[in-house]
Amino acid sequence: MTEPTPLTTPEADAPPSALAAGLDRKVAGISIGIVVLFVAASLGFPDWTANVINSGFSGAAKWFGAYWQYLLLITFFVAIILAFTPYAKARLSTGKPEFTRFKWVSMIMCTLLAGGGVFWAAAEPIAHYIASPPYYGDSLESESDQASAALAQSFVDWGFLAWAILGTLGAIVITHAHSKGMPLRPRTLLYPIMGKKVLHSWIGTVADVVAIIAVVAGTVGPVGFLGLQVSYGLAEMTGIPNNYATQLIVIAVLTGIAALSVSSGLNKGIQILSRANVWLAIALMAAVVVLGSAGYVFKAFLGGFGTYIGNFVGMSVYQGDPTWLSGWTVFFFGWFLGYGPLMAIFVARISRGRTIRDLIICTAVIPPVLTTVWFSVLGGTGIMFEQQNPGSVGAAYESDGLPAVVMSIAAQLPLSGLVGGAFLLLTVTFVATTTDSMSYAIAQSCTISGEPSTKLRATWAVMMGVAAAVLIAIGDGGISGLQSFIVITAVPVGFLMLPSVFAAPIYARRMA
């Protein structure tokens, strides 16, 4: 493969007015316009908007779900094979790493997990325990088998494949292209097939806009759900009214934290918040294990992880029940795929000085393993309580959804008030970390060259908070619709990520 002619200075052909501001007004304007249009349509025509989104979601899942499953699986295997080649010793850039390994991995982990790191970790295993995944049919004979299958399915949705698409091959392509003068923007993922032409092509503009909208949808959704979930939790714990005013206060606090964090930059706010988040998660995980049952959690992890590895390929590409898949695996894979381009930009930016092997191991191996442990602690403890007292967790999930599972687990532990409060705090910090990191990546995607301005970073954080606050005014439907929209945007993003599968190994060889 002949390497495309590099563009030494992306600024060379940029219009002077755009360069002076550093802002790509076309990309920023179109992206903001689409977000505003979606919010306005949701408020003015909620039923029509919901029908359009649901139809688009169903079509995307039906026609592209299998493609996403195989794309994520192939990406993971290519990345792992690449990690064991001599080329993996190549560094992503010259100089020493900008962050310590702990800070670096913390930033990567907290950005992806968001609120799902708490609520889905507790709720998804329970959901699959109550209604076993169709992959297993009627083969699950005991409660232990059901628990292992429930955890294994959760690991499929949040495990190795989800992490591999976010920060491995795409980050390698972006880093290599950036060394040739390309910007840290989603369009750079097309560098392997378009070269420098993508800089000023309408295709590049479309790539940037689609990637930005996907991440906005995937971030505003958790922010809005956070308002609903924390408001519910506060009402359960303290009696504070679970109403729109409480939800707005929660969103305002989170948005303020994210805006301040992203304004202070990578070296201050973002990495400090990520590190604090990880320590709080470790403390809470230890508390749940000690106050619950360490023995049960350990056995649950071994059973779930063993089932996951033993059925890894089969579960990852399972096609037997399209309706069920669209609500679980395909939904999550589409969501993570939508995050792929901007996560690749973010990971590439914070991974300067790291080797390719470091990048792959610390993105596609360590975080997903830690995620399975985390899901085993929260979800496994919930399953244990459900086995001991049927309905104590499952009934709460079926009646009140995600936040009810976390609070019902906390309520059955000693020091329930303290543990429940820690869960809510951790959820806020998780979502705030995702919001600040993705605000940085969105701002970077709207910037022609160099670092995005502080004002632009903060503006995107505030804008996503405002969008979430407006959408929850019409209830769960507005936020759910936006989260479904990310699956629709995953259709073009899936093709945007495809060149990395073939180009990353070639670029790794050239970097070695």
List each model region and its residues.
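N-terminal alpha-helical transmembrane segments of multi-pass membrane transport
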Residues: T2-S144, S500-A512
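Flexible loop linkers connecting adjacent transmembrane helices
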Residues: E11-L19, N51-F57, F84-F102, I126-L151, ...
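Membrane-water interface regions at transmembrane-helix termini and the short interhelical loops
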Residues: P15-A21, F45-A60, A79-E98, A149-V156, ...
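Helix-loop-helix module between adjacent transmembrane segments
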Residues: A18-L43, F76-V78, A114-G117, D157-F225, ...
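C-terminal membrane-solvent junction of multi-pass transporters and transport-like membrane proteins
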Residues: A20-I30, A88-S106, G295, K299, ...
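Extracellular loop-to-transmembrane helix junctions
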Residues: R25-I32, G59-T75, T111, Q146-A177, ...
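Hydrophobic alpha-helical segments of multi-pass membrane transport proteins
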Residues: I34, Y67-A83, A281-G292, L370-G380, ...
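Membrane-embedded translocation segments of transport machinery
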Residues: V198-V206, V210-R354, I361, I366-G420
